[in-house]
């Protein structure tokens, strides 16, 4: 039997159908899925991978209500966003919860590549952080981030700092902003953006850096971090290396936690 993979987004489910499956079979499967789970109102088919720096995904309507607007809940938070216009991964739910559990009372937190603000909001809602600053380049994602901050009653705790991370970093540097925690759920890009993180770090800053690697090449991710730290004249201590999920055959999302000394 051909395998299907799913991503559940509350009222919407995205199915990755096997190549060549007939449309009638897809519709039949989608209707069966909605019947077995009443919370699912819409079934979409994934037609392309996340692409570009804005990490947009392509989907096609299969059955149910004709919408790509999602209402999704996790970790005591609620999120609204458009599947095709913004990036969101429900598979990172446990990662978000784990990072929130590492935040100390009074921490100032900076989240890069924040999307519709899931990391920022989960951290703000589930920790005693003083303030969470949320950066994203995608304008559409920032609109939803603003909406989500309001939906979760966090206007006093989460601040949007939208725009290109390089320009935002320069602006924050001029304001002499330094952070206790920097979270970097990076897209699959060649550039690490660690230079920008180091510019906003101080002695004692904890950085949670995400990268992608073949299963047998995780050490290369660590070496890249050490190399970037040396370039920025920062001494670091690696605290933890974690396999944070598979994104393909033998290819992993990796999280490296490290401390600025």
Q: Which residue stretches match the model-derived regions?
A:
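SAM-dependent transferase fold signal centered on methyltransferase-like domains
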Residues: 1-261
């Amino acid at each position: 039997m051909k395998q299907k993979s799913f991503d559940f987004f509350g009222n919407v489910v995205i199915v990755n159908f096997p190549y060549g499956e007939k449309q009638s079979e897809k519709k039949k499967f989608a209707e069966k899925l909605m019947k077995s789970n009443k919370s699912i109102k819409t079934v979409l088919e994934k037609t392309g991978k996340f692409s570009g720096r804005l990490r947009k995904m392509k989907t096609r309507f299969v059955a149910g209500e004709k919408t790509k607007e999602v209402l999704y809940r996790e970790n005591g938070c609620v999120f609204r966003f458009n599947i095709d216009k913004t990036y969101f991964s429900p598979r990172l739910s446990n990662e978000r919860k784990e990072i929130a559990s590492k935040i100390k009372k009074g921490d100032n937190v900076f989240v890069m590549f924040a999307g519709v603000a899931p990391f920022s909001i989960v951290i703000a809602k589930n920790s005693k952080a003083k303030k969470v600053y949320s950066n994203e380049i995608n304008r559409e994602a920032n609109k939803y981030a603003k909406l989500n901050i309001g939906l979760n009653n966090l206007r006093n705790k989460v601040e949007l700092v939208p725009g290109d991370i390089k320009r935002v970093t320069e602006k924050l540097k001029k304001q002499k902003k330094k952070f206790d925690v920097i979270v970097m759920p990076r897209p699959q890009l060649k550039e690490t953006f660690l230079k920008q993180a180091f510019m906003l770090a101080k002695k004692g800053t904890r950085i949670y850096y995400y990268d992608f690697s073949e299963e047998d090449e995780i050490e290369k991710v660590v070496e890249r971090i050490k190399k970037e730290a040396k370039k920025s004249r920062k001494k670091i201590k690696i605290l933890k290396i974690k396999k944070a999920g598979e994104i393909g055959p033998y290819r992993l999302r990796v999280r490296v936690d490290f401390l600025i000394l």
